[in-house]
């Protein structure tokens, strides 16, 4: 257990981080707890969260608007990387953690704090992401992790908090644990801990059910420049507005729900429900424009590195030499990723129905057509195939 006099706490307003405030003071001897809540576009009543921290005993309660850097510096690189952990989860929650941890360190430096703290438990991924990031950015700061060390059950944690006037937001009527930001929602706990039980419609908040989604399909064009999405249906937007538009567009049609078994960093499997309509839509469209503008060997290599990029981010290594090296590769690969992808949204599905790139398309109709315009030299195929298959013939000559 580390010791610190002034601590900056990553604060969400939930039970664990609220209980951390009196616990740090009573059990760790911390004199000043500075609560920091990040605005990531979640739409919470942040003023209420600020008041709640003070009520729980914080010396200061700070709110930081991180929406713009969250989307521009974390979400958009993930889109260019086609980042899907285990091929499915687009890291909507994981991407926020290194940004919050970085901000904790910055505030600690500004206010001359000698420690930082978080309320992550010992079973989750976030403890890893916070600890690894803080260790990479500020190994000299004391890192306090009361929720990992106090050994209280959920009921005991709530009872401890009630002694200090902390009211739990989770009840029998709402047993779910929900994390929300502009990229989407993650929902777990409660009835969802049974992986065979279908989630009820009440757990979803930003995607329509199939029954309630429009009965007519909608067509949308998404424009990419250097791998970045820059416009939807001809309307250019800055990144935050574009994500909001993509969320609205895809969510309305019931696209973006995930119900998956996920392998956590600590080695256990968990059942996770995600709503990430806009992010999944943009990744799908980005994959398609890449297929038109990048050569096969680059696509193949990038697809393998994308999985490694997603693994690094999921496991807390945003600020690592390998992640930085992969960023360099991905940035180079995106120079020619320019063009428009047309999608059809309908009843929970997004289908790509068109793609074009004026300057960078590697699709040449005169070479691909089977019509009279065909300019491909068919006679060259025979020699190519002979050389291409030569290793197989040599093997056969020697061994058969």
Curated annotation (Swiss-Prot):
One of its GO terms (molecular function) is ATP binding. GO terms for cellular component: cytoplasm. GO terms for biological process: argininosuccinate metabolic process; L-arginine biosynthetic process; urea cycle. It catalyses: L-citrulline + L-aspartate + ATP = 2-(N(omega)-L-arginino)succinate + AMP + diphosphate + H(+). The keyword Membrane does not apply. L-citrulline binds at residues 89, 125, 129, 177, 186, 262, 274. It is found in: Cytoplasm. It comes from the Bacteria. ATP binds at residues 10-18, 38, 119. Pathway: Amino-acid biosynthesis; L-arginine biosynthesis; L-arginine from L-ornithine and carbamoyl phosphate: step 2/3. It holds the Pfam family Arginosuc_syn_C. L-aspartate binds at residues 121, 125-126. Coiled coil: none annotated. Keywords: Amino-acid biosynthesis, Arginine biosynthesis, ATP-binding, Cytoplasm, Ligase, Nucleotide-binding. The keyword Signal does not apply. InterPro entries: Arginosuc_syn_C, Arginosuc_syn_N, Arginosuc_synth, Arginosuc_synth_CS, Arginosuc_synth_type_1_subfam, AS_cat/multimer_dom_body, Rossmann-like_a/b/a_fold. Its EC number is 6.3.4.5. PANTHER family: ARGININOSUCCINATE SYNTHASE. Belongs to the argininosuccinate synthase family. Type 1 subfamily. NCBIfam families: argG, PRK00509.1. Homotetramer. This is Argininosuccinate synthase. It comes from Prochlorococcus marinus (strain NATL2A).
């Amino acid at each position: 257990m580390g010791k610190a006099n002034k601590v900056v706490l990553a604060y969400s307003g939930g039970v664990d981080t609220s209980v951390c405030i009196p616990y740090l003071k009573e059990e760790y001897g911390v004199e000043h707890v500075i609560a920091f809540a990040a605005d990531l576009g979640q739409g919470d009543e942040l003023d209420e969260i600020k008041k709640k921290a003070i009520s729980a005993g914080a010396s200061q309660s700070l709110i930081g608007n991180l929406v713009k850097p969250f989307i521009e510096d974390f979400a958009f690189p993930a889109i260019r990387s086609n980042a899907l952990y285990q091929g499915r989860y687009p890291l909507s929650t994981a991407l926020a953690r290194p940004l919050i941890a970085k901000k904790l360190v910055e505030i600690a430096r500004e206010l001359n704090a000698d420690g930082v703290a978080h309320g992550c438990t010992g079973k989750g991924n976030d403890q890893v992401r916070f600890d690894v990031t803080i260790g990479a950015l500020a190994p000299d700061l004391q890192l306090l992790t009361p929720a990992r060390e106090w050994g209280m059950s959920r009921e005991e944690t709530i009872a401890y908090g009630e002694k200090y006037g902390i009211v739990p937001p989770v009840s029998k009527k709402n047993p779910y644990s929900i994390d929300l930001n502009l990229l989407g929602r993650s929902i777990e706990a409660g009835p969802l801990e049974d992986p065979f039980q279908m989630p009820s419609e009440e757990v979803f908040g930003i995607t329509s059910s199939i029954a309630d989604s429009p009965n007519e399909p909608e067509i949308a064009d998404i424009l990419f420049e250097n791998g970045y999405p820059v416009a939807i249906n001809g309307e250019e937007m800055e990144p935050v507005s574009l994500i909001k538009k993509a969320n609205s567009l895809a969510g309305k049609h019931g696209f973006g729900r995930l119900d998956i078994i996920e392998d956590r960093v600590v080695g256990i499997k968990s059942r996770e429900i995600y709503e990430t309509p806009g992010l999944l839509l943009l990744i799908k469209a980005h994959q398609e424009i890449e297929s038109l503008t990048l050569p096969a060997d680059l696509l193949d290599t990038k697809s393998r590195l994308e999985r490694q990029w997603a693994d690094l981010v999921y496991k807390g290594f945003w600020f690592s030499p390998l992640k930085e090296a992969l960023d360099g590769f991905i940035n180079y690969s995106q120079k020619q990723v320019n063009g428009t992808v047309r999608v059809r949204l309908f009843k929970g599905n997004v289908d790509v129905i068109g793609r074009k790139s004026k300057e960078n398309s590697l699709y040449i109709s005169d070479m691909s057509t089977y019509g009279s315009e065909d300019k491909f030299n068919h006679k060259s195929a025979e020699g190519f195939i002979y050389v291409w298959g030569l290793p197989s013939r040599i093997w056969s000559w020697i061994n058969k």
